[in-house]
Structures are given as structure tokens and as C-alpha cells.
Amino acid sequence: DAFKDVDFTARLTKKDLEILRDVPEEAVKLALLDILGEPEVQKDWGGEQCDIWTDRITIDGGRHQAAFALKGPAKFHPMTVSDLGKNGDQIARLAHTAADLLVVQHCHTVKAEVVEMLRTYALRPGHVRRYMVLNGYDTLRILRHFGKV
């Protein structure tokens, strides 16, 4: 529900996407935490399960837990599985949380193989949950809507 008023149909260009080249991952993280009303800032370290853990997500009025994996401009190119941690296991780590919603956010486009991997983990029998991909265009729309860029 936090993003319900964001216009995800607004047309953006590759030139617009370049804005995110200079926005550090930490700035996106802090902006998302603020938008979600999450006061806890998790420290980054290499083997973390997620970059953001929150129970302040609401979907259709109901409260849910969400785990976010964020990828900033150090990898300013279309996201592939190899960009997801040293062993390509960041989505697997994300999926090992108790989150009801798994979110992958990137500052650029996201390749289909990443979306398929996220979908596979999210729809795992016995622990089905929602998933969301925020590519660079979606991220920019959110940040602009909330006056963060």
C-alpha cells in the first residue's frame, strides 16, 4: 500500500535511469525505510539474509513482513544472477527469511532469469508468498513520487 499512489505507468527514458548511477545503495535504502515508516536500519555485511527487514508493509490493508535485497550503482548494468552475491545466492538467502513478501530492487533493469529465480523461490510449495521486482525505472518513480531525488 505504501506505493499505491506511485504512477508506475509514467514514461521514463534511459537518460532518466542515469540519475540512479549517482544514488548510492545506502541512500535508496534510507529512502525506502523512510517511505515504509521503518525506524530500524540494518547494518550491511556480506552474508546478510536481506538489506531491509520490515513488518510495516501493508497489502490491501493487512500488515505483512517483507525482506528486501537491494543492488546499487556499483553494478550499474542489467541485473543478472551473478550480481546477486558472491555465489549468486542472495535470493536464496532472502527466501530463507520468514517474510510474506520478497523484494529485489536494482538501480537498472533486471534480467528475466533473476525474476524467474525470485518467482521460483517465492512460489515454493509449502511456503508460497508474494514477490516484487523493483527495477531502476520503478525505483526512480518511487523516489521521485516521495521527493527523494
Task: Give residue spans per PLM region.
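Mixed-charge (Asp/Glu-Lys/Arg
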Residues: 1-149
